[in-house]
Design a protein with these regions (language model features):
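SAM-dependent methyltransferase catalytic region
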Residues: 41, 45, 186-191, 213-561, ...
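Preference for the N-terminal adenyl/adenosyl cofactor-binding alpha/beta module
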Residues: 1-294, 298-300, 328-331, 366-369, ...
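C-terminal substrate/ligand-recognition segments
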Residues: 213-238, 276-292, 477-482, 697-705, ...
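Polynucleotide-recognition surfaces of large bacterial nucleic-acid defense/processing enzymes
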Residues: 97, 101-163, 341, 362-363, ...
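Structural motif
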Residues: 47-61, 191-198, 508-509, 657-660, ...
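Short, hydrophobic/amphipathic alpha-helical patches that form generic packing surfaces
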Residues: 62-71, 113-118, 202-206, 340-347, ...
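Non-catalytic DNA-recognition/assembly elements of restriction-modification systems
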Residues: 51, 286, 607-650, 662-671, ...
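Polybasic, glycine- and aromatic-enriched phosphate-binding surface used to engage nucleic acids
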Residues: 144, 155-162, 166, 185, ...
Length: 839
């Protein structure tokens, strides 16, 4: 943590120096604020684009971290005529110290950029002598390797002129010198105090102050390893076993977990090796590369044990990276770090520095959810057509040959030519597809292989969707794995209408990006292949995720779900219940799966999941079953809706002045059990689309954190306007008075019922409408209503006397009496009541 925190501070210092702005934490959230005067001569180079400033600093610091690893290999500052590995293991720090002050005050341009662009990215022949600028500063002729790969390729951002002070680099290099940089990140049990590439990924994902707003969270290494292993086991079972070979399943599990292959026959070994060589794995929200790296670390020993000494570790790694692993992310910075980790994974096993492979068409930037542009479908662009006006086979062949060839190391001039050829071929394919000229023109202006608007799955990963015949027509990925973003899609999201059109699960309540990633992940797979995601657990139940559950039941066979509650705190500094779901793309009506918790599990049968029970991933216990036997639900006896006004859209109608045309505005935070706290806001009556304000209505919280003991809580109000952070209901059946309904809503029984199914921080009105409400005789109702009246009177009296401090009114005894009567109405036994009381 010390390393992460100090790294963040150095990063923030450099950003602040250029832009005058810094992210500061306010209310648990990072907010960008103006903190000092910007260095205007440099800030102007970015034209006020603060994100570009952050990206510039992020990339520069990423390169500096990479150099820390390189110098530990002894590959930097190698004396002329000396062997690789004999270099200066503190090269960067010494290069800086040897420079005079004029160079130190312009160290980026005078030293680092020649090192990046004219050394590490430039083939200077066998001797690899560093440019004069570097040798002059260092004080002797030295060797610097040519690494290729792309990390040190100059881009448009690099052309910005920035001059940091010597104090900036002095501080950064002294900070780096405090830590041991070690390249190997394969061992999850490694406790050495140092910085490895896995930590580099963690740094990056924690560095993005807006990552949490984007719904991106860093996945712990242990969970990554579990998901990679379980996915690989499920894949090998599917590819190499018949359905009834139970004993062989144990052998495969032992092979993946312990790399034990002695129990396999030669044929079994050959089948497994072929499956491992052929496997295609993708993370569609790759982040800093945790899951692809995890898969590399799992595949490598499995292939090694089956091939013996036939290939070296580095040869196997290069084969796996080239043939088995793919990734996409909407953030360019994430893609840069993910590629960097793969290069480091290769370097760790290299005796001497060799040009690194190009990962431009392996780990790529793009919007994984869209393969269209301006309403035009681009997914069929590389579908071979013949006999039409145009035969596109030749163009496709040229394109795929160029993409595949790009992986091989080239100098930057050759790479630029190949990129131009690839784009030219794509534009030609678009013309052959007869797309509108305007669309083709707009596409030609974009960087097609690095943009945040769409991703050409079937073009860039043509080899995945057009596999050779010996792969049995498996067109698509074998494993899709990852931690997709968790973010509600807002009404003003520019892509919302496209998502609504393209995704089945984008309907019914609030849409979350992770819902769409589930559907897209399944779409990217071929039949009988494996998807493994870690996401919020909110899809277990709730109206907002009913369409997602239905999609699962109709398209997938869930293998298992491992559930982590909020208390498990899977993600640092985030309270979020999550679940690891492993499923197979396969329609199965007889599937049974388990939801595993820390001390228990819940068995779910597909046959029990249907439209009637909203496909809820929870088997009803005896208490729920009894409560469901009630003849009526809230929907049958009352009108219920979410607030009177939208707090965001109607804020122009809010005021602090009371008038005859306004009523008090109530927000959810003002509501508690049987009481409300008056505020100072009023809302104009003209904001209402329907006016029920003259009625006595039950008003209760719409936002209620999952961790709260009591999540259903409300009171009765009249002549108020409720914001949409409240829910509102009132009786439409004289046999069910408002005060009786309020007692049921505030009861422990209905709170237990709601919490059993709901895994969100909201109280969706659609779920409230389905609450079962017990019938009661007039006498039974009256007994409860009398108690409600006493509570309301006590709360009201207390508020008057104690200036809104409702906690001084202890009505717990009266509330316990109501709970006892409600339990009786639901027909619950003493043992069942005990379960609710202890929950």
């Amino acid at each position: 943590d010390d390393f992460f925190n100090e790294y963040r501070e150095h990063y923030a210092d450099l950003v602040e120096y250029i832009s005058g702005k810094r992210f500061v934490k306010k209310g648990g959230k990072f907010v960008e604020e103006k903190t000092k005067t910007a260095a205007s001569e440099f800030a102007n180079a970015f034209n006020g684009d603060d994100k570009a400033v952050r990206d510039f600093v992020k990339k520069m610091m990423g390169r500096l971290v990479f150099l820390q690893f390189l110098q530990k290999k002894g590959w930097l500052g190698v004396p002329k005529n000396a062997k690789w590995g004999t270099g200066d293991k503190n090269f960067i720090y010494n290069l800086f110290n040897n420079a005079d002050d004029s160079v130190k005050n312009d160290f980026l341009e005078q030293a680092l950029e020649p090192l990046f662009f004219n050394s590490l990215n430039c083939n200077r022949g066998q001797e690899s002598i560093a440019p004069k600028a570097i040798c002059s500063i260092y004080g002797s002729e030295i060797r610097i390797p040519y690494l290729n790969g792309g990390l040190f390729e100059e881009d448009e951002l690099d052309k910005k002129r920035v001059k940091f002070k010597k104090e900036h680099f002095e501080s950064i290099f002294e900070f780096f010198n405090q830590y041991n940089f070690t390249i190997d990140e394969t061992d999850t049990d490694d406790v050495e105090i140092g910085v490895d590439p896995e930590m580099l990924g963690k740094i990056f994902e924690n560095l993005l102050e807006d990552n949490k707003d984007k719904g991106a969270f860093y996945t712990p290494k242990e969970i990554v390893q579990y998901m990679c292993r379980e996915s690989l086991i499920a894949y090998l079972e599917t590819e190499t076993l018949k359905p009834d070979e139970t004993a062989s399943k144990d052998k495969i599990k032992n092979f993946v977990l312990n790399h034990e292959a002695l129990s396999f026959s030669e044929k079994e070994k050959a089948d497994i090796l072929k499956a491992l060589i052929d496997v295609k794995i993708c993370d569609p929200a790759v982040g800093s590369g945790a899951f692809p790296m995890g898969m590399l670390n799992e595949l490598l020993p499995c292939v090694q044990i089956l091939t013996g000494e036939a290939k070296t570790r580095v040869e196997l790694k290069k084969h796996i990276v080239k043939n088995n692993i793919y990734g996409v992310d909407i953030e360019k910075g994430a893609v840069d770090i993910a590629r960097l980790r793969f290069w480091l994974a290769i370097i760790v096993d290299e005796e001497e520095p060799l040009p690194l492979p190009n990962l431009d068409y392996k780990i790529m930037q793009g919007n994984s959810l869209l393969e269209s542009f301006e309403g035009e479908d681009l997914s069929n662009m590389t579908k071979q057509e013949s006999g039409n006006l145009f035969d596109n086979g030749e163009t496709i062949a040229k394109l795929t040959q160029a993409i595949n060839g790009f992986y091989i190391p080239h100098d930057h001039v050759a790479k630029a030519k190949i990129r131009a050829q690839i784009k030219e071929n794509i534009i030609q394919l678009l013309k052959e597809r007869q797309l509108p000229p305007k669309v083709i023109e707009d596409l030609s202006k974009l960087d097609l292989h690095e943009n945040s608007q769409f991703f050409l799955w079937h073009t860039w990963f043509y080899d995945v969707f057009n596999r050779p015949n010996d792969c049995n027509g498996r067109n698509g990925f074998d494993i899709v794995i990852g931690n997709p973003p968790y973010k509600i899609i807002s009404k003003d999201d520019s892509k919302k209408s496209i998502y609504d059109k393209n995704f089945i699960v984008a309907h019914g309540g609030k849409r979350n990006l992770y819902h769409l990633f589930f559907e897209q992940g399944i779409n990217l797979l071929h039949d009988n292949s494996i998807l493994s995601y870690i996401t919020p657990d909110t899809y277990f139940s709730g109206n907002d995720t009913e369409s997602l559950r239905e999609f699962f039941v109709k398209n997938c066979e869930i293998k298992s779900i491992v559930h982590y509650t909020e208390k498990d705190k899977v993600f640092e500094n985030v309270t979020q219940a999550v679940a690891v779901c492993i499923m197979k793309k396969n329609i199965s009506k007889n599937c049974i799966f388990h939801i595993f918790e820390k001390d228990s599990y819940n068995q779910i049968s597909y046959s029990a999941l249907n439209k009637e029970n909203k496909f809820i991933f929870k088997s009803a216990n005896i208490i729920i079953t009894k409560m469901k036997k009630c003849k009526n639900t809230f929907d049958d006896i009352c009108e219920a809706y979410k607030g009177d006004v939208n707090l965001g859209l109607k804020k122009n109608f809010f005021t602090n002045k009371k008038s005859k045309n306004t009523l008090p505005l109530i927000r959810g935070v003002q509501i508690s059990k049987y009481i409300w706290s008056p505020g100072s806001e009023y809302c104009s009556l003209t904001a209402l689309s329907k006016n029920h304000t003259d009625k006595e209505r039950i008003v209760f919280q719409e936002v209620a954190n999952m961790g709260l003991k009591q999540r259903t809580k409300g009171t009765i109000l009249k002549n108020i306007i409720a914001g949409d952070s409240c829910n509102v209901l009132f009786s439409t059946n004289e046999n069910f008075p408002n005060k009786y309904i309020l007692a049921i809503l505030n009861s422990k029984a209905i709170n237990y019922y709601f919490k059993y199914f709901n895994q969100t921080n909201h109280v969706p009105i659609g779920e409230v409408r389905k609450f079962p409400i017990p019938s009661a005789t007039p006498a039974q109702q009256q007994e409860i209503i009398v108690l409600v009246d006493k509570i309301l009177a006590a709360k009201k009296d207390c508020r008057v006397k104690h200036e809104n401090d409702s906690e001084l009114a202890d009505t717990s005894t009266l509330e316990m009496q109501i709970d006892a009567l409600v339990y009786k109405l639901y027909g619950l036994t003493d043992e069942e009541i005990k379960i609710i009381e202890q929950t």
